[in-house]
């Protein structure tokens, strides 16, 4: 290969995580957020993080969508995890808020989360969790319960580091890494 004919992207050593808990009661101070810190702890246990920041907001698409856009496109977070708003309650609108801004869906993550959840409980079938990219950020929506957060993250964390590397331009062949 001649010099200058190939651009190699360095593999990242650490990732920036933002987590967002959607809860009307939590945002009003009527409930302690347990899912948000759990998202951070579970992710930190499997991925090297250089920065993490958490948010508690009401179940409101007009609050969620601009926050995710700012975190991804304005501040350059690598990974955004949300908890809550993926069910069928009237104010569960997380998928509707985020699907219009996703550039690419990540159906493999969605399917892995659903499969893992259904293995534990049949009520997981009502989850509408989605995953996608926005710029160089992976955005994943998770159900609101601590149990579902851990189960869903356990299903996708083994592939998440590789997905982030690829999204950031890692040119190595999949399955042939040193």
Where are these predicted regions, by residue range?
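Non-catalytic beta/alpha edge segments that cap or flank active sites
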Residues: 1-178
